[in-house]
Design a protein with these regions (language model features):
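Terminal amphipathic alpha-helical/low-complexity segments used for targeting or macromolecular assembly
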Residues: 1-63
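Structural signal for interior beta-strand "rungs" in well-ordered beta-sheet cores
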Residues: 60-158
Length: 158
């Protein structure tokens, strides 16, 4: 129950509209998408890649949030609203990160290896921001709404 409690508490801390635990569980697509990703990622790491992709696609349909099963997402991440959010296969998202709707953590093409962003602890990426390629968003950095980021953002920068 630890992950669930932590996730619910993060939602309630960051969204004044989140009044009850039941409301968060039933109405927050980001919570559902992150929970589904935990299983998809487990399947992916253990070689069940097609099953992992099918599972993630099912939840993409229900939440409108696309998280590739290969993406590494720590506990303590908050996806607010979430609709249209995309997280690519080699992305890394650390604890305490806040992601809003329409955010893309995307790649730059068919390169092999690390091709998606790394978002460090406590960073905030606002609505419709596009973070493209193997760039790093530093700890506690803030990326503004509709920004297009193609280079590293240092820690504690807005």
């Amino acid at each position: 129950m630890g992950w669930w409690r932590e996730t619910i508490d993060i939602v309630k801390e960051n969204d004044p509209a989140a009044r009850t635990t039941l409301e968060v569980l039933l109405t927050y697509p980001g919570v559902k998408a992150l929970a589904a990703h935990r299983l998809s990622h487990f399947l992916w790491k253990h070689g069940f890649k097609l099953l992992a992709r099918m599972h993630s696609q099912f939840w993409r349909f229900w939440t409108q949030i696309e998280i590739h099963p290969g993406a590494q997402i720590d506990s303590g991440v908050f996806i607010d609203h979430g609709s249209g959010l995309v997280i690519g296969e080699t992305a890394i998202v650390e604890t305490g990160v806040l992601l809003y709707h329409g955010v893309t953590l995307g790649g730059t093409g068919k390169d092999c290896g690390k091709r998606h962003p790394t978002v460090r602890k406590g960073a905030l990426i606002s609505a419709h921001a596009q973070v493209i390629g193997p760039v790093e968003i530093g700890e506690n950095a803030k990326v503004g709404a509709a920004a297009v980021v193609v280079a590293d953002v240092p820690s504690d920068v807005t």
